[in-house]
Amino acid sequence: MHPVDKKSLALKIYEATGYQFRDLDLLLEALTHPRLSYKSAANYERLEFLGDAVLSMTVSEMLYRLFPDDDEGCLTRKRTALVRGSEVVEIARSIGLGELILMSGGERTCGGSDNPGTLENALEALIGAMYMDGGPEAYRSFIHKHWLARAQHMSYTPPQDPKTALQEWVQGRGWAMPLYKLVSKSGPEHKPVFAVEVSIQEHGNVLGTGSSKKLAEQEAAKLMLKKITELP
């Protein structure tokens, strides 16, 4: 991995997001692709885990305030629609994040900088890094800038996504909650295939695949829902 001009990278991120990072090593971690990092180097995976939770929490609060008459189910479906991968990827592309992700030349040549899974992961990692670097004001400002208008225009309640529908189905019948497990990841890095297994106690398991872990979970949930609704 070649040396990175951290100050130049921080300036580009400031121009893209409006946030000035203080901890440049943290920013570097948020933008480092897992395939580029060495065993001793950090990459964006841990910050992605954190950023995913921060984004979900902030959008949840936003919707709670915007739609005081919506029940839990409506709010959940709206949140799911707002934080789904395609929305996150669209925002990542709008700020030119792909060109700022640190990856190998081969990865970039194969389209890695515009890979939906990479863009989604990197933007969530960047949000997680904002949280760690500057606290609530840092990430709230960015999330509100890019998600508030989208939320305000949700005058309807989106249809349930398969994971939410499956969860509500089993809860309504007193069944054990679905458990999701990543079984495998195959294919080239710029076009991966994830396989996720969903299981419900005493009702077996089903395997779903997709170009990201989240899409594979949704596919598995859809297939499981089809299976259990066809039970006698």
UniProtKB/Swiss-Prot annotation:
Residues 10-135 form the RNase III domain. GO terms for cellular component: cytoplasm. It catalyses: Endonucleolytic cleavage to 5'-phosphomonoester. Its EC number is 3.1.26.3. The keyword Cell wall biogenesis/degradation does not apply. GO terms for molecular function: double-stranded RNA binding; metal ion binding; ribonuclease III activity; rRNA binding. It is found in: Cytoplasm. The active site is at 52, 124. Keywords: Cytoplasm, Endonuclease, Hydrolase, Magnesium, Metal-binding, mRNA processing, Nuclease, RNA-binding, rRNA processing, rRNA-binding, tRNA processing. CDD domains: DSRM_RNAse_III_family, RIBOc. Pfam families: dsrm, Ribonucleas_3_3. Belongs to the ribonuclease III family. HAMAP family: RNase_III. NCBIfam families: RNaseIII. This is Ribonuclease 3. It comes from Anaplasma marginale (strain St. Maries).
